[in-house]
């Protein structure tokens, strides 16, 4: 490799490189890692030199991760040029920066499109789409990914496996972000082969796909086609299987790269992947992905005026929620993209940051368990989609420098918190799986206002600051002293009713919403009456659904109002806590409670307004015994991380425009002084308690 380009007198290669070889590389990274997506135009250009010099300032953490994608490594098919990447990698190593090196598969060389047009995506209608900057190809095309980094020609892995800057392999980039469904002749042929073992386990395609109703009786598996536009309603189970097929295709592609030559060439350098927010068009099955990932990087952007406070964002986008997805086991460090300024493609829904918001939101993520912070874009580029993205080292450095100072101050105390986990709190047991979005895509919702992500935000918002931030979890996770929410509209549940009842006999209070368990894992209706699998547990029976017209509400005797949905509920052991006061459901229970074992199961026959959700949450918290990490003023988000030996650290994030009181004692780690009981406006306090 070429000698690193001299930056200035006194620059030396990274002397800690050999120490990183003794363990998993990210485990040796000191404290909090801070970096961003670095896409240089050239390793020698003026902007690159400015980046390197800026990174050496104390405001920027020397051990930060930088993503260096491999675009341009194959300018002509079969001809490789690593010169610029060698120079960039060497310069980053000389600066002390660790790199998450991309696998160069996010975009193919332009010449490949002429020879291999099959890598272009095909829509359900049969139209072939054209090329774009990246993420436009059909993943899984072995012929494309192997020439640079596959098993047959492992140039990238072999070349950089021992490079002192390497810390992570960044496998592809944002898989499934723009192309998550796979059509075309090859996919039509592969879909039946995927469906066969699944449907054989379910006693054949006739029962598995409900063909008696859908007039699709098959004589062989080869007759099963991928769902395409049709003049009438499509089979929802077949659509669900196709979504599984597409998600598994992404997983197979990732595994081929991550578990292939990269793992063999450097077993101590783990792979990672960026997760896109759980919203269409991305339909990943995150729980299947969790089995494959050792560390991941998750998009986390501020939600605009509707979700001004970061606490109203989906908790799933934070690190502790990834721990829950992993089944409660500790995960390896991951990187969350720190909220950026509004980009030209997000301006309609995202606001610019307020003073201190970047540091505040970043440490919110740290409080939830992450160890790596990444900014969305670093480095100036004249040609780019995101023309107004924020960079850690921008031309107006004061706010960013302040951010870097805060992170550096926190990183110096990071070793104290490292290894701790967030415990307790309220658990949202929503299976954020791809099938939860199928109903929305198929148009088979019982009410058009069931907007999955909007409902999750509504359930999440009131339980962020009052007590302990929520954790999203999976059905297999055992709960103790936690409140369980099920706000899944029409979400299939794989758990049979007897198993649910046995598992919950001694549980703490739980709460299920309307239509949460009415269908099974194959999107088929559970027979025997509603609310499906939870009917006996909840002590209610639903006679009839009463969907509400759009933008209308129904009055409740507690002073709340219900929206979207209502049901004619009969009590079969439960007691009515709130009832409807409007015809045709006057006097019919709207919120019920059923004592089960030492706990209780609550049921919502309508979707309460914000006041109702807060009141209901207060009741559930009081009944469950969940306690806030500390007493604090409204608008202060609290999270506690603890070690097994009892040491604990309280994160207090003040989202207010005025200072707020927090009842806690200990040393404030960022300032290094005793905590005085108040958190300044828009600031964060990290308190070593005791």
Swiss-Prot record:
Activity versus pH, per record: Optimum pH is 6.6. Maintains activity over a broad range of pH values from 6 to 9.
Keyword Zinc (UniProt): no
Highest taxon in the source lineage: Bacteria
InterPro entries: Beta_galactosidase_C, Beta_galactosidase_Trimer, Class_I_gatase-like, Glyco_hydro_42, Glyco_hydro_42_N, Glyco_hydro_b, Glycoside_hydrolase_SF
Keyword presence, Hydrolase: yes
Comment on activity versus temperature: Optimum temperature is 45-50 degrees Celsius. Activity declines rapidly above 50 degrees Celsius. Stable for at least 70 hours at temperatures 35 degrees Celsius and below. At 50 degrees Celsius loses all activity in less than 15 minutes.
Catalytic activity: Hydrolysis of terminal non-reducing beta-D-galactose residues in beta-D-galactosides
PANTHER family recorded: BETA-GALACTOSIDASE GANA (PTHR36447:SF1)
Stated family: Belongs to the glycosyl hydrolase 42 family.
Known role: Highly specific towards beta-D-galactoside substrates. Hydrolyzes 5-bromo-4-chloro-3-indolyl-beta-D-galactopyranoside (X-Gal) and o-nitrophenyl-beta-D-galactopyranoside (ONPG). Has activity against p-nitrophenyl(pNP)-beta-D-galactoside, but not significantly at all towards pNP-alpha-D-galactoside, pNP-beta-D-glucoside, pNP-beta-D-mannoside, pNP-beta-L-fucoside, pNP-beta-D-xyloside, pNP-beta-L-arabinoside, pNP-beta-D-galuronide, pNP-beta-D-glucuronide, pNP-beta-D-lactoside or pNP-beta-D-cellobioside.
Name of the protein this chain belongs to: Beta-galactosidase
Originating organism: Arthrobacter sp
Phylogenetic placement of the source organism: Bacteria, Bacillati, Actinomycetota, Actinomycetes, Micrococcales
């Amino acid at each position: 490799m070429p000698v690193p380009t001299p930056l200035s007198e006194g620059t030396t290669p990274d002397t800690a490189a050999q120490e990183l070889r003794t363990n998993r590389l990210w485990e040796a990274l000191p404290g909090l890692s801070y970096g961003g997506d670095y896409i240089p135009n050239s390793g020698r250009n003026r902007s690159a030199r400015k980046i390197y010099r800026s990174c050496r300032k104390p405001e920027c953490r020397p051990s930060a991760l930088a993503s260096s994608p491999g675009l341009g490594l194959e300018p002509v098919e079969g001809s490789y040029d690593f010169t610029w990447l060698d120079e960039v990698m060497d310069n980053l190593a000389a600066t002390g920066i660790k790199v998450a090196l991309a696998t160069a598969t996010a975009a193919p060389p332009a010449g490949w499109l002429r020879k291999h047009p099959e890598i272009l995506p095909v829509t359900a209608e049969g139209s072939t789409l054209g090329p774009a900057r990246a993420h436009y190809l059909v993943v899984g095309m072995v012929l494309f990914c192997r020439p640079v980094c596959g098993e047959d020609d492992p140039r990238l892995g072999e070349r950089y496996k021992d490079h002192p800057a390497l810390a992570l392999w960044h496998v592809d980039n944002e898989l499934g972000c723009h192309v998550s469904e796979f059509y075309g002749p090859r996919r039509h042929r592969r879909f039946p082969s995927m469906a066969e073992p699944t449907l054989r386990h379910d006693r054949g395609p006739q029962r598995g796909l409900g063909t008696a109703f859908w007039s699709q009786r098959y004589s062989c598996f080869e007759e099963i086609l991928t769902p395409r536009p049709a003049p009438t309603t499509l089979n929802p189970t077949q659509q669900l299987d196709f979504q599984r097929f597409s998600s598994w295709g992404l997983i197979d592609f990732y595994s081929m790269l991550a578990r292939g030559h990269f793992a063999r060439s450097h077993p101590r350098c783990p792979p990672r992947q960026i997760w896109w927010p759980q919203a269409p068009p991305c339909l990943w099955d995150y729980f299947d992905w969790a089995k494959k990932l050792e560390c991941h990087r998750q998009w986390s952007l501020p939600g605009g005026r509707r979700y001004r406070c970061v606490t109203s964002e989906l908790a799933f986008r934070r690190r502790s929620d990834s721990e829950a997805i992993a089944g409660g086991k500790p995960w390896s460090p991951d990187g969350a993209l720190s909220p950026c300024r509004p980009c030209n493609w997000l301006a309609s829904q995202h606001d610019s940051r307020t003073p201190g918001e970047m540091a505040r939101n970043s440490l919110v993520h740290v409080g939830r368990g992450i160890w790596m912070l990444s900014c969305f874009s670093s480095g100036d580029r004249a040609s780019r989609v995101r023309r107004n993205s924020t960079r850690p080292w921008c031309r107006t450095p004061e706010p960013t420098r302040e951010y870097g100072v805060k992170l550096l101050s926190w990183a110096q105390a990071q070793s104290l918190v490292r290894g701790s986990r967030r415990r307790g709190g309220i658990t949202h047991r929503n299976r954020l799986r791809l099938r939860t979005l199928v109903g929305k895509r198929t148009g088979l919702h019982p009410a058009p206002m069931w907007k999955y992500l909007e409902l999750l935000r509504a359930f999440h918002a009131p339980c962020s600051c009052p007590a302990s931030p929520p954790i999203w979890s999976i059905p297999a996770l055992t709960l103790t002293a936690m409140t369980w929410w099920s706000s899944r509209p029409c979400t299939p549940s794989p758990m049979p009713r007897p198993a649910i009842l046995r598992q919950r006999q001694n549980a703490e209070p739980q709460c299920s919403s309307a239509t949460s368990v009415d269908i099974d894992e194959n999107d088929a209706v559970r027979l025997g009456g509603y609310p499906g699998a939870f009917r006996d547990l909840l002590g209610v029976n639903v006679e009839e659904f009463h969907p509400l017209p759009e933008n209308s509400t129904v009055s409740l005797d507690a002073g709340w109002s219900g929206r979207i949905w209502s049901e004619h509920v009969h009590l079969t052991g439960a007691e009515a806590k709130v009832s409807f006061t409007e015809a045709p459901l006057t006097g019919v229970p709207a919120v019920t409670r059923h004592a089960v074992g030492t706990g209780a199961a609550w049921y919502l026959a309508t979707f309460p307004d914000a006041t109702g959700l807060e009141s209901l949450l207060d009741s559930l918290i009081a009944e469950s015994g969940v306690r806030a990490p500390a007493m604090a003023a409204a608008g202060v988000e609290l999270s506690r991380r603890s070690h097994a030996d009892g040491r604990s650290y309280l994160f207090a994030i003040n989202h207010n425009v005025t200072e707020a009181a927090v009842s806690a004692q200990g040393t404030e780690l960022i300032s290094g002084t005793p905590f005085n009981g108040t958190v300044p406006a828009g600031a964060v306090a990290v308190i070593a308690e005791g």
